[in-house]
Design a protein with these regions (language model features):
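Short beta->alpha connector loops
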Residues: 1-3, 46-47, 127-128, 152-153
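Extracytoplasmic "Venus flytrap"/periplasmic binding protein-like
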Residues: 4-21, 32-34, 135-145
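Venus flytrap/periplasmic-binding-protein-like
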Residues: 20, 26-27, 101, 143-165
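Hydrophobic/aromatic residues located in beta-strands of well-ordered beta-sheets
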Residues: 19, 39, 65, 146-147
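Extracellular/periplasmic Venus flytrap/periplasmic-binding protein
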Residues: 26-28, 36-141, 159, 177-183
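Rossmann-fold dehydrogenase core element
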Residues: 38-41, 163-175
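A structural micro-motif
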Residues: 17, 37, 91-92, 144-145, ...
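Short, ordered loop/turn segments at secondary-structure junctions
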Residues: 1-2, 24-25, 70, 151
């Protein structure tokens, strides 16, 4: 993910070896410099996905959002991008929480989110760990809409989350459903 790609950029540049980075953060390609010229990002920028999520929020009357994301560059970049775009759209972030990829519980963070009574919650995580805050919100009775980043667009999210993640809103690449797209 993002932390790994950022961590090896210097080594790839020194070796003159191109690196394919399946990450959302633009930090691996911007600002362009000698080490970033070796990185080729394969997924959409977080800003593009954030814009789509915010458009959906606006369309559905969301005025307040709780944010919970990884306590690493992925989560921090998402908070930076999303908070700026949300503010422009008139959406207020009423709670902001972080968690580690290895956490076994986010009960404390979810309690703080619930106390803020947001219209919706955005989970900024990737892979299997996207399920933990989502299912914890559901288990504690949260009734608002739950949004996920394109980091949740993976089979593990559905497999691990099961029925508790039904109704999730996320934006992702057509590559995920390419066989279903008409020619």
């Amino acid at each position: 993910g993002s932390p790994n790609a950022v961590g090896v950029m210097q080594f790839m540049a020194e070796a003159g070896t191109p690196m394919l980075a399946p990450v959302g953060t633009t930090a691996v390609v911007l600002p362009m410099d000698e080490k970033r010229r070796w990185v080729f990002k394969t997924t959409q920028n977080d800003a593009l996905i954030s814009d789509a999520l915010i458009a959906h929020m606006v369309k559905h009357g969301v005025r307040t959002v709780g944010f919970i994301g990884f306590n690493d560059p992925y989560g921090e970049n998402w908070y930076t991008v999303f908070s700026a775009q949300a503010q422009k759209a008139g959406i207020r972030i009423v709670a902001s929480e972080r968690f580690l990829r290895s956490d076994g519980s986010v009960a404390g963070q979810v309690a703080k989110l619930m106390a803020a009574k947001p219209d919706a919650v955005l989970v900024a995580a990737a892979g299997g760990p996207t399920v933990l805050p989502h299912t914890t919100l559901v288990d504690t009775g949260y009734k608002g809409r739950i949004y996920q980043t394109h980091g949740a667009a993976a089979p593990d999210f559905l497999r691990l989350g099961g029925a508790k993640v039904e109704g999730t809103v996320l934006a992702a690449s057509l590559m995920l459903v390419l066989p279903e797209v008409a020619d």
